[in-house]
Amino acid sequence: SDVCSSDLTVGQKGKEMTEMGEMVKAGAVAFSDDGIPISDGEVMRLALMYSGQFGVPIINHAEDVDLRGNGQMNEGRWSTRLGLTGIPDVSESIMVERDLQLAEYTGGKIHIPHVSTAKSVNAIRQAKEQGVNITAEVTPHHLYFDDSSLQTYDTNLKVAPPIRSEADRDMLISAIADGTVDCIATDHAPHTVEEKENPFEYAPCGMIGLESAFGATWKMLSANKISLLDV
């Protein structure tokens, strides 16, 4: 039978859960509201409780939307130099910490997508050591680029979560090497040339990931002595 992931909440509104049990019977293997974070902690608690019962992971875009605000890139030295509104790394790690604690509390199964910060890696590593049922992924573009790459205002590098600092990137590579991060996923999100030709502030988030995924990943990991078999 066909398998797929399903919306976690009705209309991806983050308020009313879908019928997880019926969806699992129909072939759903995971639940997610895609790029819309579940901000309501009680909804996430219930989702994780059911995920433990049904044996399927909850995938939550880990981002505090209030902390993100109208941010355009990673908050730091380069956002200041480029005059672009920054997105603090804690906008991700705060949500990761919440979800990890809820997964531990409920016995649920959580998957953290597109991890981008050192703070998140540290939280995931600690949770795994404590036996929390968790998996995590990184994207090729978060392994390949750092926020200095945005100095050309290339809108193709405007993604969510944003490209982070060199220190964050180095931590992501280390997390693959030691198994804290379980897999690499493209987060493939193409847009038209016309959309990406808008000024940086108005261009949509997302980049093409399929064509360059292996090449970019292998270049960075091989340079850090990670074997092809591990990749």
Task: Annotate each predicted stretch with a short phrase.
Residues 29-30, 55-59, 109-111, 133-135, ...:
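Structural preference for beta-strand elements that scaffold enzyme active sites
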Residues 114-167, 173:
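Acidic, glycine-rich loop-and-beta core segments that form the ion-binding/anion-interacting portion
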Residues 81-109, 156, 177, 183-184, ...:
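His/Asp/Glu-enriched, well-ordered alpha-helical/loop segment
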Residues 41-60, 64, 86-105:
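Metal-dependent enolase-superfamily TIM-barrel catalytic cores that perform enediolate-based chemistry
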Residues 12, 33-36, 60, 88-92, ...:
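Glycine- and other small-residue-rich loops at beta-strand/loop junctions that grip anionic moieties
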Residues 3-5:
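Short, small-residue-biased leader/transition segments that mark boundaries at the very start
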Residues 43-44, 65-80, 95, 120-129, ...:
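Histidine/acidic-residue-rich catalytic or RNA/ligand-binding cores of hydrolases
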Residues 11-49, 157-163:
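Active-site gating/metal-coordination segments in enzymes
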